[in-house]
Amino acid sequence: MTIRVLGIDPGLTRCGVGVVDVRRDRRATLVEVTVIRTPAEMPLEQRLLAVGDGIAALLDRYSPAAVAIERVFAQHNLRTVIGVAQVSGVALHTAAQRGLPVALHTPSEVKAAITGYGSADKKQVQAMVARVLGLPEAPKPADAADALAIAICHAWRGGLAALSTSGAVGAAGPAAVPGAALTPAQAAWRAAERSTARTSSAPRRLAR
């Protein structure tokens, strides 16, 4: 049983989109990865339309169970952050039109999920994406690898929980193999989940 997630690394010039199938044992398989590009000289409304059409086509072609988008965070370049926010809005709207659940994940959440370290650099994330997916190298440009990381992050952080009650979600795939070996990233994330669970279950002392 698998969950299919479409991940989006929003950007106006380059919007990375990656689709992965993730089994209940957290093994991930690459389905598709691409980058939607729009030229800077194109009118803004046409650029957003092109990105929206590209995302819509991929949603309709691969029928994911969920969509995951990188959450906008503060950047020094105001024009860049505005473009990212605009594309994020288009992606949210396009997914909502199809009744798909959408999750937003911060860069730190994605890094922690993929590498086990929330301050990992881009090269470390890209290397782990390639390793998790069994690829000889990370897809290029970086926007493509980032989109895959976002999709994997969502599946590992909560998307797989639906499998425990509803069976296969999204595209059909091979059944999970109980007790299968985890990748280093998967093992680190599972250990982090256990640590978080222990911490959250302990009584908290009120501040004085």
Curated annotation (Swiss-Prot):
Q: Which InterPro entries match?
A: RNaseH-like_sf, RNaseH_sf, X-over_junc_endoDNase_Mg_BS, X-over_junc_endoDNase_RuvC
Q: How is the cofactor bound?
A: Binds 2 Mg(2+) ion per subunit.
What is the top EC class of this enzyme, as a single word?
Answer: hydrolase
What keywords does the record list, in alphabetical order?
Cytoplasm, DNA damage, DNA recombination, DNA repair, DNA-binding, Endonuclease, Hydrolase, Magnesium, Metal-binding, Nuclease
Q: Example GO biological process term?
A: DNA recombination
Q: Does the keyword Cytoplasm apply?
A: yes
SUPFAM superfamilies cross-referenced by the UniProt entry? Ribonuclease H-like (SSF53098)
Provide the residue positions that the database annotates as binding Mg(2+) 1.
Answer: 9, 143
Instruction: List the Gene3D superfamilies.
Output: Ribonuclease H-like superfamily/Ribonuclease H (3.30.420.10)
Where does the chain bind Mg(2+) 2?
A: 70
Q: Which catalytic residues are annotated?
A: 9, 70, 143
| Keyword Hydrolase found | yes
**Which cofactor names does the annotation list?**
Mg(2+)
**Where in the cell does this protein reside?**
Cytoplasm
Q: Which GO terms describe its cellular component?
A: cytoplasm; Holliday junction resolvase complex
Q: What is its EC number?
A: 3.1.21.10
Per the record, the similarity remark reads: Belongs to the RuvC family.
Provide the assembly information.
Homodimer which binds Holliday junction (HJ) DNA. The HJ becomes 2-fold symmetrical on binding to RuvC with unstacked arms; it has a different conformation from HJ DNA in complex with RuvA. In the full resolvosome a probable DNA-RuvA(4)-RuvB(12)-RuvC(2) complex forms which resolves the HJ.
What's this protein's name? Crossover junction endodeoxyribonuclease RuvC
